[in-house]
Amino acid sequence: MNSLFASTARGLEELLKTELENLGAVECQVVQGGVHFKGDTRLVYQSLMWSRLASRIMLPLGECKVYSDLDLYLGVQAINWTEMFTPGATFAVHFSGLNDTIRNSQYGAMKVKDAIVDAFTRKNLPRPNVDRDAPDIRVNVWLHKETASIALDLSGDGLHLRGYRDRAGIAPIKETLAAAIVMRSGWQPGTPLLDPMCGSGTLLIEAAMLATDRAPGLHRGRWGFSGWAQHDEAIWQEVKAEAQTRSRKGLAEYSSHFYGSDSDARVIQRARTNARLAGIGELITFEVKDVAQLTNPLPKGPYGTVLSNPPYGERLDSEPALIALHSLLGRIMKNQFGGWNLSLFSASPDLLSCLQLRADKQYKAKNGPLDCVQKNYHVAESTPDSKPAMVAEDYANRLRKNLKKFEKWARQDGIECYRLYDADLPEYNVAVDRYADWVVVQEYAPPKTIDAHKARQRLFDIIAATISVLGIAPNKLVLKTRERQKGKNQYQKLGEKGEFLEVTEYNAHLWVNLTDYLDTGLFLDHRIARRMLGQMSKGKDFLNLFSYTGSATVHAGLGGARSTTTVDMSRTYLEWAERNLRLNGLTGRTHRLIQADCLAWLREANEQFDLIFIDPPTFSNSKRMEDAFDVQRDHLALMKDLKRLLRAGGTIMFSNNKRGFRMDLDGLAKLGLKAQEITQKTLSQDFARNRQIHNCWLITAA
């Protein structure tokens, strides 16, 4: 009896144990990452040929304690290598693990190689050559703390390489894991199986091979036992012949069918090639189509299983499309696949929740470094009185109501950008802004007392409902997360896409960027203030301080300002402002753009203006500004400097986002100024619920 070890992906050990026992293995013992077992020579070959789950089959040769590199050398040399190798066999060493002595795996591999070679030369035998690419024998050494475990890798290349897939192709899951997913899916061979996001077809191919009794090792060309002296070619040929006979019989007797589809024509072509190379191409129908086009291939029965490894996203900007995809799949399953089973393998349990289905079973597994889950569902047959489940129903109803209210108003006023929803319902704590045919959903970061998983799931529900209610393409929804705004974090860079969208606001054309910054380049709550500036600016010299992207300057210019001066500290936003001005035909010397610390520029300037707009941050301590600024504390000093630049009969429009801001009216009077609060006049109906989003004042000479 041979003592053997089969390695596998984490989470598949018990499944592998059952498989090995069915092959005839005895004394199976599960450990993390594999199964120890025993069997005769025939079982060695059967496990290599038939195991769908094992990554490698190892023949342990011994262990040694390693307190120095000499211990490793002597421990390896103690094994009778000359009885292991056939004459002329090449070999390679795979060394993994480190300790205080062996701190480099390449060094460890070199010591093992030296010990093996010296074992031959000391007996005056020809030394075996090393072949790292295609060796006849692979020696595996695993060092854990002070113990080195030495084994022959009888597999050669990993057993997931079945021989039917182009090794250069990108594979989201290995064939061994795919086989486990099929086994755990609840699918019964002889019933239909469908993968609507099949990629290169691995799940369907593994299922078809299982159903037709086709050994996973049948197509492999090289093995790790070709240079092993104990290899029994006669028994191996018997095992191989039996596998070929069973495969032919299984294929001839199988009558059910497999269906695969994907939106990428290139991967579908690869899937067809892989299936043909696996010998089961005639059983699988592959089509190029999107999940949205998915239909039941057998509407009159029999029932089957939908099995897939859907995409998941690591970036925030990919989530809306994935949420929409999973929500859509859930709806299609309920509408067209009543009575079927569904099994999905994913690295994102939250996305699976978007299906709005209750899982009957779930399994955990590792896909490389990723923690994954497989969930199995049974889709109930629909009845005439069954109603589709609503996602975030209260939120969806409010959004639908707001849409009806605001859409007509915005169209009549020539507004393409407006707020549709602003945390109207406390449990759905987001803002939803429309920019032409795009939508930005901003999640206000939930308090730490809220369970993170529940908050994330609620956000996914919000996105699914938003896409459904507004009828937009998922790729036109942008998702952002922000703290409740404390001042304007307008300079925070989020990305580098550089994609700008032209929008209209009354008679102005403006550029917005929905993805690269926390804000988009257009503060929607100031829309009416900008229109007022346009109406007040005819024939006047206009100054815009803390100008951001210059949208107020555009309105002033279009309103007939004699000149405009736009000042901001950011070169990025001044260039953006210049693009906005140019888009509206506002060019030339009468439209100046100045990059400067606005407070320092204000103290040094000696020009005169008829109309000044200033929208400073609530608080700023930027390294590029000379002093820290607090709008509540410093607004009088600001007014003193502004008064010096204000021409007789001129007006200052002063706005800020400080909640609870108190204007020092007595202090203003001492400066010879008076203030009229116009906040309510500047709040449009889409911001009527948030009356503290800004405050706005007109300041003139007393």
Curated annotation (Swiss-Prot):
It comes from the Bacteria. Keywords: Cytoplasm, Methyltransferase, RNA-binding, rRNA processing, S-adenosyl-L-methionine, Transferase. It is found in: Cytoplasm. It is an enzyme of class 2 (transferase). Its EC number is 2.1.1.173, 2.1.1.264. InterPro entries: 23SrRNA_methyltr_KL (IPR017244), DNA_methylase_N6_adenine_CS (IPR002052), RlmKL-like_Mtase (IPR000241), RlmKL-like_Mtase_CS (IPR053943), RlmL_1st (IPR054170), SAM-dep_methyl-trfase (IPR019614), SAM-dependent_MTases_sf (IPR029063), THUMP_dom (IPR004114). PROSITE patterns: THUMP, UPF0020. GO terms for molecular function: 23S rRNA (guanine(2445)-N(2))-methyltransferase activity; RNA binding; rRNA (guanine-N7-)-methyltransferase activity. This is Ribosomal RNA large subunit methyltransferase K/L.
